[in-house]
């Protein structure tokens, strides 16, 4: 019993160093927030209204609306195996959803 008390009394207490993050992020308060439309134009993506206007004009590419995003994302989706792809929604199911359920 006496030996364990002596061992614990002779232990050295270590000082814990304060945490210093390895990743430095820029100060967000200094940077003004860009307008959403400006950010889309600078990224080269079509704005939401232009996609809608293309669809209303009868565009021949329904895949454009289905796979919105960068072109590489659309290519990845096309190469996915069938079990990982989104199930297509039938016209009847779309109408059911638009109605809000059974009549």
Swiss-Prot record:
N-acetylmethionine PTM positions: 1
Q: Which gene encodes it?
A: KGD4
**Family listed:** Belongs to the alpha-ketoglutarate dehydrogenase component 4 family.
Gene Ontology CC terms: mitochondrial inner membrane; mitochondrion; oxoglutarate dehydrogenase complex
The record, for InterPro entries, names: Kgd4/YMR-31
Q: Residues annotated as region Disordered?
A: 20-69
Positions carrying Phosphoserine are: 49, 61, 90
Modification type N6-succinyllysine: residues: 5
Q: What is this protein called?
A: Alpha-ketoglutarate dehydrogenase component 4
Spell out the Polar residues composition-biased ranges: 47-56
Source taxon at top rank: Eukaryota
Output one GO MF annotation. protein-macromolecule adaptor activity
The entry's function note states: Molecular adapter that is necessary to form a stable 2-oxoglutarate dehydrogenase enzyme complex (OGDHC). Enables the specific recruitment of E3 subunit to E2 subunit in the 2-oxoglutarate dehydrogenase complex (OGDHC).
Which source organism does the UniProt entry give? Homo sapiens (Human)
List the GO biological process terms: 2-oxoglutarate metabolic process; tricarboxylic acid cycle
Indicate the secretion signal residues: none
């Amino acid at each position: 019993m006496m030996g364990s008390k002596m061992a614990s009394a002779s232990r050295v207490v270590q000082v814990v160093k304060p945490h210093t993050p390895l990743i430095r992020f820029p100060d967000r308060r200094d940077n003004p927030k860009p307008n959403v439309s400006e950010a889309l134009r600078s990224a080269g993506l079509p704005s939401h209204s232009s996609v809608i206007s293309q669809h209303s004009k009868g565009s021949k590419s329904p895949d454009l609306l289905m796979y919105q995003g960068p072109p590489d994302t659309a290519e990845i989706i096309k190469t996915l195996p069938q079990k990982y792809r989104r199930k297509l929604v039938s016209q009847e199911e779309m109408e059911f959803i638009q109605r809000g359920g059974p009549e």
